[in-house]
Amino acid sequence: MRLFIILSVASFGAIGVLSQGGGGGGAAGGLLEGGGGFEEYGHRSRGSIIGLSRGIEIGRHYGGGGGGGGEGEEGREHELRGGGLELGGGGGGGGGGGGGGGEGRHYEIGFGGSHFNTPVDVHHEEAIHLKAHPEYHSDYHVADHKTKDFKSKHEVRDGYKVKGTYSLLEPDHKTVRVVDYVSDKKRGFIARVSYRKHH
């Protein structure tokens, strides 16, 4: 039976999968609760760490020794520190039957990203140039009896042709100037000016 534990760090957007071979619930419970590590009592299994995201540094460190009827619990640690996850296993000698230090394995996952040259997918999209038909209609009017400011403007654009008219009260306050104009690509700007009495 294989046990997969997904390690996820949301702030870095990286995910790693820890695969553990071998045995039963003792190893799984121990790994998640602080004991057990990567080996069950009396059985050695091989662990591997698979990086699934860009920028994960994976290191594996082994200790020496072996033997003993069981493994010591000291030295097993799981902690998240400084942008990486460190899983430690191993420890002192077993309780009976043999002397040497237990096998110590040390797994480390960091999120540096500076050592990897992973390809970056670059998608070049073809630009779509749409030519919209320019069209608008605008007009405004001002009639201020206190300052004697009277003016108006009306303009319509259809494609590249613009036509409109504007009028304003002359400084003598008796005459209104009216300008009718047309503008297009062929003829340019053509204006016709006329005057009428203000009433």
Curated annotation (Swiss-Prot):
The keyword Nucleotide-binding does not apply. GO terms for cellular component: extracellular matrix; extracellular space. Residues 133-199 form the Chitin-binding type R&R domain. Epidermal regions synthesizing hard cuticle. Residues 63-103 are annotated as: Disordered. Induction: By 20-hydroxyecdysone. The keyword Signal applies. This is Adult-specific cuticular protein ACP-22. It comes from Tenebrio molitor.
